[in-house]
Amino acid sequence: MKNKNKRLLVMAGGTGGHVFPGLAVAKQLQSEGWEIRWLGTADRMEADLVPKHGIEIDFIKVKGLRGQGLKKLIAAPFQILGAISQAKKHIKAWQPDVVLGMGGYVSGPGGIAAWLSGIPVVLHEQNAVAGLTNQWLSKIAKRVFQAFPGAFPNAEVVGNPVREDVCQLPHPKERFAQRTGPIRLLVMGGSQGARILNTTLPEALPQLSHEIEIWHQAGKGSQETVEQAYRDNGIADAKVTEFIDNVAEAYAWADLLVCRSGALTVSEVSAAGVGSIFIPFMHKDRQQALNADHLVQCGAAQMIEQQDLTVQGLVDTLNGLERKQLLEMACNARDAAIIDADVRVANAIKSLAK
């Protein structure tokens, strides 16, 4: 006899950009009485992260095809068929009502297995360029959602799930109301840092025509090097950290952000209401540049492509931003935010449950 509670199987893996949005939707449905289980791979971050959130996880063996040698490409169809078979066994054993694909290699075999088993599939694409797996699965999914316009021609734009403490920050008009003095510049290159930000910012800031207060997330293993770079350029009071544990606090502090434009970062800075200068990571499909483009078009951000980034160019960009414009950018960012992506996706899942 099937359990009376509705069940969702989440398929997501590989990176935080896939896993964290999946967890947000899972938590939303858990709060409404749903049972959640996860499908992932044993050698990626979901294997450790998902159980810490109290969700049981099953594993299948699957790897990406890009960059593989000829022998592995020849063997790939057999590996994919094996992964689909493994996923079907997990689905048959647990009998979910709906399957949610958030991207990563695991979503492909898992989504096909769900479709073959007659289980409705819901997709969410976090980036402005759809991943290969989601491109395939969009043809068999019952509902397809996208965080930014352009990933799919007719999919509903629902944003990315954003952590609650970021969504609850006061409006920029309230935060900026009494601010005077040096402009507060927050630099974030992700948990691994960004070498180009770590080298360019310390050179650029001493050349600015106005005072800057700096908080720089350097990434793992780079704190001392970046601190020394600031000192070498005459800035002794730069706040440099490996990581920022409380991102909401950092966004609330900042007048302006210089950062990469990963999908979750773009969604977070919009929800927080902070103007940004995006330096997209160079990728052949320009994924990060297209993620940033939505906020650039609505006046919430500026973008400098990595190949165009120079010390003098960054100096000129920063010198052109005064407090009035920073407030306008921050307000435009907040106006563009979609802060209920988890609820929207959860509602679609509920509508498909029999």
From Swiss-Prot:
It is found in: Cell inner membrane. Its EC number is 2.4.1.227. It is an enzyme of class 2 (transferase). Pfam families: Glyco_tran_28_C, Glyco_transf_28. It catalyses: di-trans,octa-cis-undecaprenyl diphospho-N-acetyl-alpha-D-muramoyl-L-alanyl-D-glutamyl-meso-2,6-diaminopimeloyl-D-alanyl-D-alanine + UDP-N-acetyl-alpha-D-glucosamine = di-trans,octa-cis-undecaprenyl diphospho-[N-acetyl-alpha-D-glucosaminyl-(1->4)]-N-acetyl-alpha-D-muramoyl-L-alanyl-D-glutamyl-meso-2,6-diaminopimeloyl-D-alanyl-D-alanine + UDP + H(+). One of its GO terms (biological process) is cell division. One of its GO terms (molecular function) is UDP-N-acetyl-D-glucosamine:N-acetylmuramoyl-L-alanyl-D-glutamyl-meso-2,6-diaminopimelyl-D-alanyl-D-alanine-diphosphoundecaprenol 4-beta-N-acetylglucosaminlytransferase activity. Pathway: Cell wall biogenesis; peptidoglycan biosynthesis. Keywords: Cell cycle, Cell division, Cell inner membrane, Cell membrane, Cell shape, Cell wall biogenesis/degradation, Glycosyltransferase, Membrane, Peptidoglycan synthesis, Transferase. UDP-N-acetyl-alpha-D-glucosamine binds at T15, G16, G17, N127, R163, S191, I244, A263, L264, T265, V266, S267, E268, Q288. PANTHER family: GLYCOSYLTRANSFERASE, UDP-N-ACETYLGLUCOSAMINE--N-ACETYLMURAMYL-(PENTAPEPTIDE) PYROPHOSPHORYL-UNDECAPRENOL N-ACETYLGLUCOSAMINE TRANSFERASE 1. Belongs to the glycosyltransferase 28 family. MurG subfamily. Cell wall formation. Catalyzes the transfer of a GlcNAc subunit on undecaprenyl-pyrophosphoryl-MurNAc-pentapeptide (lipid intermediate I) to form undecaprenyl-pyrophosphoryl-MurNAc-(pentapeptide)GlcNAc (lipid intermediate II). This is UDP-N-acetylglucosamine--N-acetylmuramyl-(pentapeptide) pyrophosphoryl-undecaprenol N-acetylglucosamine transferase. It comes from Aliivibrio fischeri (strain ATCC 700601 / ES114) (Vibrio fischeri).
